């Protein structure tokens, strides 16, 4: 058996594989906190946002806008770029994950589409790079205006099962500029069937029309299939 992530020390946490990390989170019974950190600007010179988040109690750190093919975290000095994630794990004592965005070139956009680098996009190369860098988990989601769809998230999960050994999180915090439901029972089932470990959904009240009833129904579906649910605030209400 594994130690709860809220009780585990650094050496225990960083030894966990994807399956063990999932069980460690499950055993913590809803008290696990993940902090998403933008890596392009440090909060303070020579100090990463991840270190600050860990100091304030984050159990998991998720890097946003991180390019897996050009690894760099502002505020972090490393001898070699390939050691970026390992050093951040050592400094924070936390599992480190990365956002990869399953962009849909055919998406019906509600706003101007933003172009992102290949190292931020969900593809075989970026997933293998995430594996080589030592990330503990990946999160398939979309930043505003990137054109990420639930259809492509499900496809990315299937690809990740063949190219990444860590925990897999899947879902949208907001629309990512696309005209489709942010979270639905149908898309959740697709993510689970594809092999997702954790389903990401928006917190109630953070996006228009996502209700408590919908969240409860999704949680029941995910738990029935042995998965976990992460309720997120990714739209600045925090």
Give the location of each predicted region.
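Active-site-adjacent beta->alpha loops and helix N-cap segments on the catalytic face
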Residues: 10-26, 44-47, 69-88, 144-165, ...
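Acidic (Asp/Glu)-rich catalytic clusters
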Residues: 26, 50-57, 82-93, 127-134, ...
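Hydrophobic faces of well-ordered beta-strands that scaffold small-molecule active sites
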Residues: 31-37, 61-63, 94-102, 138-140, ...
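Active-site mouth loops of central-metabolism enzymes
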Residues: 31-48, 102-124, 170-186, 230-238
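Non-catalytic, usually N-terminal nucleic-acid engagement modules in DNA/RNA processing proteins
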Residues: 36-102
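Glycine-rich phosphate-binding active-site loops on the catalytic face of alpha/beta enzymes
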Residues: 59-71, 132-146, 190-208
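Hydrophobic alpha-helical segments and helix pairs
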Residues: 106-159
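Catalytic alpha/beta core domains of metabolic enzymes, predominantly
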Residues: 198-238
């Amino acid at each position: 058996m594994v130690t709860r992530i809220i009780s585990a020390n650094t050496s225990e946490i960083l030894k966990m594989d994807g399956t063990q990390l999932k069980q460690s989170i499950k055993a913590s019974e809803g008290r696990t906190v993940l902090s998403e950190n933008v890596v392009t600007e440090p909060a303070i010179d020579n100090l990463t946002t991840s270190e600050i988040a860990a100091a304030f109690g984050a159990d998991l750190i998720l890097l946003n806008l991180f390019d897996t093919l050009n690894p760099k975290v502002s505020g972090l000095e490393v001898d070699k770029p390939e050691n970026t994630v390992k050093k951040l794990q050592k400094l924070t004592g936390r599992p480190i994950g990365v956002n990869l965005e399953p962009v849909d070139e055919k998406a019906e956009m509600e706003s101007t589409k933003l172009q992102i680098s290949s190292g931020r996009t969900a593809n075989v190369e970026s997933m293998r790079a995430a594996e080589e860098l030592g990330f503990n988990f990946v999160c398939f989601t979309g930043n505003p205006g990137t054109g990420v769809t639930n259809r492509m998230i499900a496809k990315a999960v299937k690809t990740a099962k063949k190219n990444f050994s860590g925990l897999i999180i899947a879902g949208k915090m907001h629309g990512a500029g696309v005209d489709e439901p942010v979270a639905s029972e149908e898309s959740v089932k697709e993510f689970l069937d594809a092999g997702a470990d954790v389903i990401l959904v928006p917190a109630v009240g953070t996006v228009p029309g996502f209700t408590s009833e919908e969240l409860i129904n999704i949680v029941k579906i995910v738990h029935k299939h042995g998965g976990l649910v992460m309720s997120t605030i990714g739209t600045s209400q925090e």
